[in-house]
């Protein structure tokens, strides 16, 4: 299988318009809509098996199209499916953290969140044989109420984050956050390079069209047009898409969810794989870490966005309090 090679520094500060493909990998019953449900052990076992099956199917399809992606994986999968994590990394994809068991940031205090970040990062790095640079909070749960998480992240060894969605939503979102890459600053002054998901700007509002249920609900052209708008109108021109392996499992047993949650969770699942197939055949994708490496070579500043008081001056170059070195693409240990 292909091995990921380090990215070399760019001589020119010219940024390549980029579309990032990412997957948030958790088992079917770990989704936020199922929080608090009592899921039988037999169903959990089936979901674990189906998660691996559909993830490997996605890996095969990505290999056929020569596409590299970023996989944000919950730590418990590193424990239960270590070979899967290793195979994702061995195929050249980036491994990122996605918490230990898909708990939202709101359910932690700072100490608990720091420990969750640590054990997840350690477990993934052990299986993948390479460093983990990126993090995405479950359900994009870094919001104004949990801005303190940026201070914790900045001291955790991660280089970038993809947890802030610049939209209005009942579960997440900071609607006035920048739509393109920016430096997010926590109330304690910790800063992280932030890669937000795709939005579509219309009537002074950001519409959430970057993946998940929105991708399943809307026609494919909505996603395609949103990518075009992001590349044409934002700077740096970056469009981040996100999906979940369970969304490509049309035959999965349904969880006993309430009506609205059931609709949000399962709408469009049967057509999701075909829509992704169309994107893979028409769009060139990159890993998040490769975009981050290129952003680090830019000479100009990125927008700064504060989630609290006590903000220190953020360098014009992209740095974070906890990981200021320029990242290279993760390479597996020999």
Which residue stretches match the model-derived regions?
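Catalytic alpha-helical scaffold of carbohydrate-active enzymes acting on polysaccharides/glycoconjugates
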Residues: 2-134, 139-203, 222-333
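Surface-exposed cleft-lining segments at the edges of enzyme active sites
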Residues: 207-217
């Amino acid at each position: 299988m292909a091995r990921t090679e380090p990215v070399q520094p760019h001589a020119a500060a010219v940024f390549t318009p980029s579309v990032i493909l990412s997957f948030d990998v958790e088992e079917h019953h770990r989704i936020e809509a199922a929080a608090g449900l009592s899921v039988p052990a037999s169903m959990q076992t089936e979901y674990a098996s189906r998660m691996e099956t559909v993830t490997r199917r996605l890996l095969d399809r990505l290999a056929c199209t020569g596409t590299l992606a970023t996989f944000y994986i919950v730590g418990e999968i590193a424990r239960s499916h270590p070979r899967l994590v290793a195979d994702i990394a061995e195929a050249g994809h980036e491994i990122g953290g996605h918490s230990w068991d898909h708990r939202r940031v709101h359910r932690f205090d700072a100490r608990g969140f720091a420990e969750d970040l640590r054990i997840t990062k350690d477990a993934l790095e052990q299986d993948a044989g390479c460093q983990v640079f990126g993090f995405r909070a479950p359900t994009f749960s870094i919001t104004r109420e949990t801005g303190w998480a940026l201070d914790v992240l900045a001291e955790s060894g991660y280089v970038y984050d993809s947890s802030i969605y610049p939209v209005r939503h009942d579960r997440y979102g900071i609607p006035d956050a920048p739509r393109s890459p920016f430096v997010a600053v926590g109330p304690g002054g910790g800063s992280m390079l932030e890669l937000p998901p795709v939005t579509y700007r219309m009537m002074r509002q950001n519409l959430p069209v970057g993946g998940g249920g929105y991708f399943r609900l809307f026609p494919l052209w909505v996603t395609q047009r949103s990518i075009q708008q992001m590349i044409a109108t934002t700077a740096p021109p970056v469009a981040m898409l996100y999906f979940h392996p369970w969304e490509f499992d049309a035959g999965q047993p349904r969880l006993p969810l309430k009506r609205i949650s059931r609709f949000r969770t399962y709408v469009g699942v049967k057509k999701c794989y075909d829509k992704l197939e169309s994107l893979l055949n028409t769009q060139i994708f990159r890993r998040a870490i490769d975009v981050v490496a290129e952003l680090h070579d830019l000479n100009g500043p990125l927008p700064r966005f504060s989630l609290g008081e006590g903000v220190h001056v953020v360098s014009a170059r992209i740095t974070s309090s906890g990981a200021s070195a320029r990242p290279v693409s993760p390479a597996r240990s020999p």
